[in-house]
Regions:
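Mature-region segments of soluble proteins
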Residues: 53-57, 71-174
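Post-signal-peptide N-terminal segment of Sec-exported extracytoplasmic proteins
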Residues: 65-71
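Short amphipathic alpha-helical segments enriched in leucine
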Residues: 20, 59-63, 97
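N-terminal secretory signal peptides
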Residues: 1-10
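Sec-dependent signal peptide hydrophobic core
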Residues: 19-27
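Residues marking the start of alpha-helices
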Residues: 6, 43, 105-108
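C-terminal segment of N-terminal export signals and the immediately downstream linker at the start
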Residues: 9-14, 27-63
Length: 174
């Protein structure tokens, strides 16, 4: 009698886990971007999922904040997933990938080292694509109230009586 462990093939556990994973890939659909840690996900309608993932990485490289999750960068990039913006964004991502390939990196998203990605961005920082993404990030990222605590910003003060009434008149720090 042969012991089950000595048989070639896969175990029941492997079969079940692979079946579930394969089934999930059909349910999720094509226009889907998910975090590597599984903490968030978003669907794209006009951009390719890989292009959106590249834009998110680009956003993180332009304004790097280790204390912020990719989810907030994804929210900031969501506006570029429109019929009007998608062609320019796809062309910009193609230019990023071409620059990375020219350096022997594969694609921008596959470039492992941040300093290499930043060098790629520096090479195109005068482009309309780069300026559009960078400019949109200023409001798209920093206008999210959920990220304010990470920077110690308490938000606007007018609706709370102004800054003076909230302890900002203490000049002991001078």
């Amino acid at each position: 009698m042969t012991h089950a462990a000595s048989r070639p093939g896969i175990t029941r556990r492997q079969l079940l886990s692979r079946s579930v994973a394969a089934g999930a890939s059909f349910i999720v659909g094509a226009g889907f971007v998910a975090a590597t840690d599984g903490a968030w996900a978003m669907e794209t309608t006009h951009l390719k999922p890989r292009s959106m993932a590249t834009l998110i990485q680009m956003a993180r490289d332009i304004y790097p904040h280790d204390q912020l999750a990719d989810e907030y960068y994804a929210i900031a990039m969501r506006g570029y997933d429109s019929a009007e913006a998608a062609p320019a964004m796809e062309a910009g991502v193609a230019a990023l990938d071409a620059a990375a390939e020219g350096r022997g990196e594969g694609s921008y998203l596959d470039t492992l080292w941040e300093r290499d990605r930043v060098d790629i961005l520096r090479g195109m920082e005068r482009s309309v694509f780069f300026q559009t993404v960078r400019g949109g990030l200023v409001t798209g990222l920093y206008n999210q109230p959920e990220v304010w605590p990470a920077f110690g910003y308490e938000g606007e003060s007018f609706s709370k009586g102004g800054y003076i009434a909230r302890g900002f008149d203490d000049i002991a720090w001078l």
